[in-house]
């Protein structure tokens, strides 16, 4: 690798470490010409996840869009963003483990509901009401009675 300080072509790797659950490799390098040290990072370039919408459109998975939906579900609940980020990380990991490059928004919604069910009942009901497009009080009552049975 070329030295960013003097442009010398051949640098040495002094230290190598895996970080972020072995998805990134950090290398500490030294230039034999100018003796400066610098750090480089190697990442696996992952194929983007495409989301198949209800109407059949496909769009790239948007982490921020999912985070916004989760944040709406947990408004005025004592749940910090770190927990929401962890949920999103788990969902992305689950999708990648399936080995698919496309997934329906419905499947993502199911995954979110499973995570929220364990996290907070109110957030679960809020998310379910939007995800399942509740249009009556009876639908809320049915969901609540199902939750009580479990």
UniProtKB/Swiss-Prot annotation:
Function: Negatively regulates transcription of bacterial ribonucleotide reductase nrd genes and operons by binding to NrdR-boxes.
Domain (ATP-cone): residue spans on this chain: 49-139
Name listed for the protein in its UniProt record: Transcriptional repressor NrdR
ZnF region ranges: unnamed: 3-34
Alphabetical list of PROSITE patterns matching this protein: ATP_CONE
PANTHER family the UniProt entry points to: TRANSCRIPTIONAL REPRESSOR NRDR
Originating organism: Dictyoglomus turgidum (strain DSM 6724 / Z-1310)
Co-factor binding comment: Binds 1 zinc ion.
Any one Gene Ontology BP term: negative regulation of DNA-templated transcription
GO molecular function, one term: ATP binding
Pfam families in the record: ATP-cone (PF03477), Zn_ribbon_NrdR (PF22811)
């Amino acid at each position: 690798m070329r030295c960013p300080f003097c442009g010398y072509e051949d640098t040495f790797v002094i230290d190598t470490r895996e970080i972020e659950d072995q998805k990134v490799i950090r290398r500490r390098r030294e230039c034999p010409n100018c003796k400066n040290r610098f750090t480089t990072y190697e990442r696996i370039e992952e194929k983007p996840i495409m989301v198949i919408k209800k109407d059949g459109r496909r769009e790239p998975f948007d982490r921020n869009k999912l985070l916004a939906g989760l944040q709406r579900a947990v408004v005025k609940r004592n749940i910090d963003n770190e927990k929401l980020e962890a949920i999103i990380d788990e969902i992305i990991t689950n999708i990648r483990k399936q080995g698919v490059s496309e997934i329906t928004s419905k499947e993502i919604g199911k995954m979110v509901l499973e995570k929220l069910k364990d996290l907070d009942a109110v957030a679960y009901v809020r998310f379910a009401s939007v995800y399942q497009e509740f249009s009556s009080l009876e639908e809320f009552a049915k969901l609540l009675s199902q939750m009580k049975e479990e």
